[in-house]
Amino acid sequence: MEAKKDKAQQVADVSHLLSTSAGFVIFDYTSMSAIEATSIRKKLFKNGSKIKVIKNNILRRALKAGKFEGIDETAIKGKLAVAVGVNEIVETLKAVDGVVKAKEAMNFVCGYFDNRAFNSADLEKIAKLPGRNELYGMFLSVLQAPLRKFLYALEAVKAAK
């Protein structure tokens, strides 16, 4: 009886962790070494994110309890870890993607953020997108280019006189 209460508490804790986060990514960590696990934990910690290894049955129940619609529960099998993004889920996804790319046996299973479920193919595409700071840089360079051209034109007119 005590074991059931303990499992129910674990389900509640995991459900609370997932529902209060910005999003999460579930991935297969089958061939990840201890060094790679430490590396990914450090990268995620810098982003304010965390990684948890949760039993599949508890994870399935937590997903049901949290009402995360669209997640394929049949995909929750094998050795899985959950990367939970507290602030910025895209940075969390990129950190996990760096390790997943290095190992062929590892792959994304599914993810959930912005009130939407994503499959592994979607997560791989999103991980290839530039991050927030890179997008800001691109945007500013686009804004700066016309001003720079205008200044060069003014200098050319000034030099012509």
UniProtKB/Swiss-Prot annotation:
Q: Does the keyword Transport apply?
A: no
Q: What is an annotated GO biological process for this record, any one? A: translation
Query: Any idea which UniProt keywords this protein has?
Result: Ribonucleoprotein, Ribosomal protein, RNA-binding, rRNA-binding
Q: InterPro entries attached here?
A: Ribosomal_uL10, Ribosomal_uL10-like_sf, Ribosomal_uL10_bac, Ribosomal_uL10_bac_type, Ribosomal_uL10_CS_bac
* Entries under Pfam families matching the protein: Ribosomal_L10 (PF00466)
The cysteines covalently paired via disulfide bonds are: none
Q: Which domain of life is it from?
A: Bacteria
**Any one cellular component term from GO for this entry?**
large ribosomal subunit
Any one GO MF term held by the record is: structural constituent of ribosome
Under the heading PANTHER family, the entry gives: 39S RIBOSOMAL PROTEIN L10, MITOCHONDRIAL (PTHR11560)
Function, as annotated: Forms part of the ribosomal stalk, playing a central role in the interaction of the ribosome with GTP-bound translation factors.
Subunit field text: Part of the ribosomal stalk of the 50S ribosomal subunit. The N-terminus interacts with L11 and the large rRNA to form the base of the stalk. The C-terminus forms an elongated spine to which L12 dimers bind in a sequential fashion forming a multimeric L10(L12)X complex.
The family this protein is said to belong to: Belongs to the universal ribosomal protein uL10 family.
- What is this protein's record name? Large ribosomal subunit protein uL10
Tell me the organism: Mycoplasma pneumoniae (strain ATCC 29342 / M129 / Subtype 1)
